[in-house]
Amino acid sequence: MSTITLLCIALAGVIMLLLLVIKAKVQPFVALLLVSLLVALAAGIPAGEVGKVMIAGMGGVLGSVTIIIGLGAMLGRMIEHSGGAESLANYFSRKLGDTRTIAALTLAAFFLGIPVFFDVGFIILAPIIYGFAKVAKISPLKFGLPVAGIMLTVHVAVPPHPGPVAAAGLLHADIGWLTIIGIAISIPVGIVGYFAAKIINKRQYAMSVEVLEQMQLAPASEEGATKLSDKINPPGVALVTSLIVIPIAIIMAGTVSATLMPPSHPLLGTLQLIGSPMVALMIALVLAFWLLALRRGWSLQHTSDIMGSALPTAAVVILVTGAGGVFGKVLVESGVGKALANMLQMIDLPLLPAAFIISLALRASQGSATVAILTTGGLLSEAVMGLNPIQCVLVTLAACFGGLGASHINDSGFWIVTKYLGLSVADGLKTWTVLTTILGFTGFLITWCVWLVI
């Protein structure tokens, strides 16, 4: 099948999905699965393999996020029902004011994003975003959009995240220099993203019922409702902060140990197990069960009801995120990404813009930032021969920032952000997609300026 035909099929799939979700109001989970099936058949994937590809796409995404979303949702619900999120938000709002609180939370997200994967970190911070927004009486999007933007920037551009690490190997870039330059460029990119998010947030966007309930702006279900007595004596700032910092610190310890300790070290396996996001969140949830619930007089049944009330909302996020993974997997298996990359490679572009444009096109066409970055690295691995070490790093970063832009409906991260922030698909495209594209182009332009200077 020709490249043009594959690209037309992929484009038609995206348009059909948007029409189904935005115009026909079809539930995104169903729409994603239906369009994935039709695109797979149209792209020539054998009928007997279509089901396997769709299951692999669902499993590939949910294998990494289901447990994290479930545990993170229960931890967040415990913190929220105890009054801890509002307690923390009130403290920082008094100290900093609303505007500086948004900036401070964005700065904290920058440092959190270095050792912690984007989806894990965002899920951990979600209850804090809700708490701050509730106290400030503003949309959680005003906090969540810059936070998610800076965390994704760090995720695609700074080791030890998989995209930049693997691309560095393919493009012969030094990991140390990549870390230093990646962080240095991510700082001004984050500043631009912060102000871009402020401009985007000047418009009011409707929130989903689930987020309205979380913000206590709509009647909650009986089992999810917060008893007034639960918040009479809310936990202190130090306790709430500890419950958020502990899983992050544990994950950081696992990441650092994998980097610094030799593979033969007897403690490495144990530290990596404890430092996995799943185990770190389980530890934090057990601590919350004791410190926020039992020690404060909640009954076992009441505690169980509160934890269980987090799961219906989490299930929606999980299913839609998994369906987004199915759509992305179908696009990858159809060969649209490889065909597009080969076509772009034939165009005589300078090396740095080529790395960015190929990666951005791959990101837009098949959804995964990591796949876009790795594919670009493989295509340009021979082209970087003869470059000096810093130039190799800059080519790597150009590919990374290409993978940052154009997050939309074929990206599982798009569904995580929009569902947690209560956005419709149309509003997600107007906010999150626009912001990631601004961040990607900003990162590339700064990288190109450095290239011209050296």
Language-model features and meaning:
Residues 98-113, 137-156, 174-183, 187, ...:
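Alpha-helical transmembrane segments of multi-pass membrane proteins
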Residues 43-45, 80-85, 95-99, 132-143, ...:
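Juxtamembrane helix-boundary/capping and inter-helix hinge elements in multi-pass membrane proteins
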Residues 177-226, 401-454:
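Juxtamembrane and boundary regions of transmembrane helices in multi-pass small-molecule transporters
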Residues 47-135, 297-385:
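Membrane-embedded alpha-helical segments and adjacent helix-loop junctions characteristic
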Residues 1-10, 62-68, 117-121, 184-186, ...:
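Structural signature of hydrophobic alpha-helical transmembrane segments
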Residues 2-4, 180-305:
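Long, contiguous bundles of hydrophobic transmembrane helices that form the permeation core
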Residues 7-21, 33-41, 69-74, 108-112, ...:
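Hydrophobic core segments of alpha-helical transmembrane domains in multi-pass membrane transport
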Residues 1-74, 87, 91, 95, ...:
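Hydrophobic transmembrane alpha-helices of multi-pass solute/ion transporters
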